[in-house]
Amino acid sequence: MNNIRTIKGGTKLKGKIKVPGDKSISHRALIIGSIAKGNTTIEGFLHSEDPLSTADCLRKLGVNIPKIIKDEPFTISGKGLDGLKEPKEILNCGNSGTTMRLLMGLLAAQEGKNFILTGDASLNERPMGRVGKPLSLMGGKISGREFGNKAPISINGEKLKGCVIGTPVASAQVKSAILLAGLNASGTTSVIEPASSRDHTERMLKAFGADISIRGELGRNIVITSGGNLIGQRILIPGDISSASFWMIAASIVPNSEVLIQNVGLNPTRTGILNVMDSMGCNYEILDKSTIAGEPIGSIKVKTSNNLRSFTVEGDILPKLIDEIPILTVAACFCSGVSEIKDAQELRVKETDRLKVMARQLQKFGAKITEKEDGLIINGQSKFHSAEVDSETDHRVAMSLAIASLLAKGTSKIMRAGAASVSYPTFWEELDKLTN
């Protein structure tokens, strides 16, 4: 994570690429495949640090997961809903909040078994009470530092009771943890969200045979009933639109660029980036649309756009593009007028405080950004000069700064550029490919 990358500004992007498998779906394929009956074969898995942390934890829970080799399919032998073993050691989730939060839900319902979850220094400072509190309403026994809000987290598996839970924030991780707990809870568990969040868990549980339904206004009420079994499936994981977004924005704002990104997941709970690109006036088209295992996919062709318009991101669209805010902040610097990010407090408790970090680092290039409690105000039509910037160990910051460097006059340095490997291990190779 400590390596340095140098990037020469003024370089156009040309070519076609495939982005790595979707990180969210990779986590869920491992977890749901592990508690299904029979075998689950996974293709297109994201071979990066976070999903590999999930695989390592599941192995310690007794799941037979082979060594995962990049770009090769593999098969999990599922243990069934109550077949996980009490581990002999602490489960280390690395830097992955998804791993920790989803496992909290899964393990809280493993009656009579005890577990301890920890992570790296960054993860152990991220809020976990947002998962622990709703699980406690179901009868879960979860404790941790700062009144259960921070890891290490201790879980005493219990027989949980289904209930109706309203989540204070639209979070796919919180929702997914409750649904996974609901698989082993008595009766019916209902999750009501304030806004729709990404729905990969619901789609995959349904594909595996769970009794799950989507109800209410805008699909914000998800109901799961226990009592059945999950049956192993063959899962083909599409490319991650959050990873594709770096190239989509880069091709839009770097002069004379044209990029085709193939086989990208187009789940409607994840395509907020396309809505913003429409508002900006970006020049793109979606090709080769299809649906695989309930997930819509397609290829996205993007060409440079002139006179991009400023935009505002706020409200219900935030959950659909929460991971794209860093690269959209870069885009805003090159739009006409003033753009604004609102209602984005969630970014302050990601791998870093992404609002603060993006403002601090882009200002080094000459960006005019004002930080607010819940977002950013970005003045457009910036003229970037070269700078030495730092990912501050955040993968999405590292990649966003790389794209920003292409717009800077001169050669820029990115410190701790290796952070990109958390979600996109081949990012730097792809950047070299598209710029040469």
UniProtKB/Swiss-Prot annotation:
Protein's UniProt keywords contain Transmembrane helix: no
Pfam families: EPSP_synthase
GO cellular component labels: cytoplasm
EC number of the protein: 2.5.1.19
UniProt entry keywords in alphabetical sequence: Amino-acid biosynthesis, Aromatic amino acid biosynthesis, Cytoplasm, Transferase
Positions contributing to 3-phosphoshikimate binding: 23-24, 28, 171, 173, 323, 350
SUPFAM superfamilies xref list: EPT/RTPC-like (SSF55205)
Record carries keyword Cytoplasm: yes
Chemical reaction(s) catalysed: 3-phosphoshikimate + phosphoenolpyruvate = 5-O-(1-carboxyvinyl)-3-phosphoshikimate + phosphate
Record: active site: 323 (proton acceptor)
UniProt GO molecular function: 3-phosphoshikimate 1-carboxyvinyltransferase activity
Binding residue positions for phosphoenolpyruvate: 23, 97, 126, 173, 354, 396
Subunit: Monomer.
Entries under NCBIfam families matching the protein: aroA
Official protein name in the record: 3-phosphoshikimate 1-carboxyvinyltransferase
Organism: Prochlorococcus marinus (strain MIT 9215)
Gene this protein is translated from: aroA
